[in-house]
């Protein structure tokens, strides 16, 4: 099974994003979602959200923004199949490691994130806040996921 661990801020939006949720939070750009969709289509990968946006699952304050994000992704044909665990004292890479331990069926994965992911440098595709997910990032992720 192939997985894309998805961060949102700095991946699906960038320094030039001018869209906002109904509550006023910086949102996502359609063209960046389409790049993610191209990656998923080319690799038949499953999306697992590792972004702090997942806190909207349990936090009432962020719930509406979270629902708006999921609806936006779905409108582009991007389905989020799961979420990394929230471990209050853990770095994101520890949460991803825990998810991988709980899902041994995952044999290939990439991590799309603008932050450092120290445990998985070979699978980390580091995006830049300035640009978000680029075509080059997508190509690199496809190579990792489709490697035989």
Predicted regions and their residues:
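Catalytic phosphate/metal-binding cores of nucleic-acid and nucleotide-processing enzymes, i.e., regions
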Residues: 1-148
């Amino acid at each position: 099974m192939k997985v894309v661990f998805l961060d949102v801020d700095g991946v699906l939006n960038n320094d030039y994003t001018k869209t906002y949720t109904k509550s006023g939070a910086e949102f996502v750009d359609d063209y960046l979602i389409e790049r993610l969709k191209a990656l998923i289509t080319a690799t038949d990968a499953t999306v697992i959200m590792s972004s702090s946006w997942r806190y909207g699952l349990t936090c009432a304050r962020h719930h509406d923004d979270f629902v708006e994000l999921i609806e936006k992704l779905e409108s582009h044909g991007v389905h989020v199949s799961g979420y990394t665990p929230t471990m209050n004292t853990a770095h994101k890479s520890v949460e991803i490691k825990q998810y991988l331990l709980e899902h041994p069926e995952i044999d290939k994965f990439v991590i799309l994130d603008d932050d450092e992911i120290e445990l998985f440098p070979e699978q980390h595709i580091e995006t830049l806040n300035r640009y978000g997910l680029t075509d080059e990032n997508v190509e690199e992720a496809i190579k990792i996921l489709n490697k035989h």
